UniProtKB/Swiss-Prot annotation:
CDD domains: Radical_SAM (cd01335)
This protein's name: Biotin synthase
UniProt cross-references to SUPFAM superfamilies, sorted A to Z: Radical SAM enzymes (SSF102114)
Species, as recorded: Acidothermus cellulolyticus (strain ATCC 43068 / DSM 8971 / 11B)
Family recorded in the similarity comment: Belongs to the radical SAM superfamily. Biotin synthase family.
Length: 335
């Protein structure tokens, strides 16, 4: 335990993430030492990311009917899931962006359940980005699956600020989660995103049956990628999917994982996303915001309910954590 805390102190001092063996040791920290680990992760975040928590809202432009077989996902058309295919029109997307901005969020992410965007989806996204930019001062992100070079360039050109494409899990465990495409295909899309000039958002889901060794492997692989944002999800088992009967990650396990990712990526936005309500609850979320996490998705997720945004904003105020503003919002308020 002393070695783990000494390693964390080194990250605080130098801003260089832990090695994979060191990350693995973080996951063995006992419950009695967990508060000290979380405090160190929080201090690392404050030193290397600064104060404040970034708020984001997400909306699904195309829900369900996905041809891929991601075993955690109720939107796959291959599983006996209650989710059915549907599209959201432009006025509703603009309304969702306005509601997100009203919470103080800096990011609004347009998500589609697809392998990758076809011409119809790209037309819809172009129109949505144009309409939202005319109506709302908020950064627009997208999560549309696997991209071609031309698609990545077009998204950057129309003003997409950040692109999300999760690696989901360690490279060694990925074939147990998805069989219809490869980890390497996802990695390649992330390289296209960066080359096009967009910020890279890449994280994954914990609790899909991976080992602790593979969690540390995943954190080290994300550190190699060095994304601008890492969304950290916890499996919320969905009926009809292959992972429907997996157990939910415990609070202590989730907090150790959050601290590990912060110590792997001292300068990255580490955002709690899907599953935090069922895994952490209010008390666990509070501990995590004092344990390395500096981003939240507010409101509902793609197919599951989230927390009331007002409750998250009240929690941030209670903790004395300001909401981070984007350059776009700062410029708008200055004018």
């Amino acid at each position: 335990m002393t070695d783990v805390l000494a390693s964390a102190e080194r990250v605080l001092r130098d801003g260089i993430g832990l090695t994979e063996p060191e990350l693995r040791a973080v996951l063995d920290v006992d419950d009695d030492s967990l508060p000290r680990l979380l405090d160190l992760a929080h201090r690392v975040r404050r030193r290397w990311c600064g104060p404040g928590v970034e708020i984001e809202g997400i909306v699904s432009v195309k829900t369900g009917g996905c041809p891929e077989d991601c075993h955690f996902c109720s939107q796959s058309g291959r599983f006996d899931s209650p989710v059915r295919s549907a599209w959201l029109d432009i006025p509703n997307l603009v309304t969702a962006a306005e509601q997100t901005a009203a919470t103080g969020a800096t990011e609004f992410c347009i998500v589609a359940a697809v392998r990758g965007p076809d011409d119809r989806l790209m037309r819809q996204v172009r129109a949505a980005v144009r309409a939202i930019r005319e109506a709302v001062d908020i950064n627009i992100s997208c999560s549309l699956g696997i991209l071609t070079p031309d698609q990545a360039a077009e998204l950057a050109e129309i003003g997409v600020h950040r692109y999300n494409h999760n690696l989901e899990t360690a490279r060694s465990y990925f074939p147990s989660v998805v069989t219809t495409h490869t980890w390497e295909e996802r990695w390649q899309t992330l390289q296209l995103v960066r080359a096009a000039g967009m910020e890279v958002c890449c994280g994954g889901i914990l609790g899909m049956g991976e080992s602790l060794d593979q969690r540390a492997e995943f954190a080290a692989q994300l550190a190699d990628l060095d994304p601008d944002e890492v969304p950290l999800n916890f499996l919320d088992p969905r009926p009809g999917t292959p992972f429907a009967d997996l157990p939910v990650v415990s609070v202590a396990e989730a907090l150790r994982a959050a601290a590990m990712f912060r110590l792997a990526l001292p300068r990255t936005i580490l955002r709690f996303a899907g599953g935090r309500e069922i895994t952490l609850g209010d008390a666990g979320t509070r501990d995590a915001l004092r344990g390395g996490v500096n981003g939240l998705i507010v409101g509902n997720y793609l197919t599951t309910l989230g927390r009331d945004p007002a409750a998250d904003l009240a929690l941030l105020a209670e903790l004395g954590e300001p909401i981070r503003r984007s350059e776009l919002q700062a410029l708008s308020q200055a004018l």
